[in-house]
Amino acid sequence: FKQKTAYEISACLVGSEMCIRDRYNSSETLNKLKDKGVTSFAMELMPRITRAQSMDILSSQSNLAGYKAVIDATYLFNKAMPMMMTAAGTIAPAKVMVFGAGVAGLQAIATAKRLGAIVSATDVRMAAKEQVESLGGKFVMVEDDETQDAETSGGYAKEMSEEFKLKQANLISETLASQDIAICTALIPGKKAPLLISKEQVNSMKPGSIIIDLAAESGGNCECSAAGETNNVNGVTVVGVKNITSTISQDASSLFSKNVLNFLDLLIDSETKELSIDWEDEIVKGILVTKNKEITNEEFI
């Protein structure tokens, strides 16, 4: 649940269990849950281990978000995506650049390729290069010593130095000006989304170009985006996406509910059908946020 109201928290029974999301932006909610004595779990903190894959809400929802971002961009784009050769002439394929090659980014690359676009992508993690290229995308990246250690143990991107960000900005400027569509998916857990596209870079794009910023709710990868708003910047349409999976709700709800059901299977004894939580389980320890009127996760203390 996201941003629980005071009434909803007051209605919770002491010692009850609850799953929450958007935990980094819910400090007030966390403190209220702690004071109430509610045991809460943040499903987004699910460890990146094989046993937890079926419970990973980030992966299931991000997969849909990456797909829908490209579909929305295609709808807004006033040209065709694939190359078409006709008796009346040839239509050049659209050029799509994806920022961030996590689950959402990789799905965006795959979807854009299936629609016939020429796709490039950028990420700070060297591990992403092979994944991007395996999907037919061109990998655009500043390769230096810092990129060798740009990934956390959980598989997420780390925040990079200002020097690296400057190098990256210069490289992106060279590439972005020729792109028709930019899909922004880069996030850093617990921190504001990295700024990857400046206003000057937006102005360098061709009129009619589209930017879909999936990171808008976390500050945005594009300087010109705002969550829930669509802005026109010198002919470039900038969409600050807000809860994009709600626009593909049937599949999003189906996957999310299955993730939660699989997590509940972990908490409930298969024989007695009663709650039986192993507090030493790696998954439980990884996503536990509040218990016994304490915040248990070090990230939020």
Identify the residue ranges that each predicted region occupies.
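Glycine-rich phosphate/diphosphate-binding loop of Rossmann-like nucleotide-binding domains
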Residues: 82-175
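Rossmann-fold NAD(P)-binding glycine/threonine-rich loop
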Residues: 24-48, 192-243
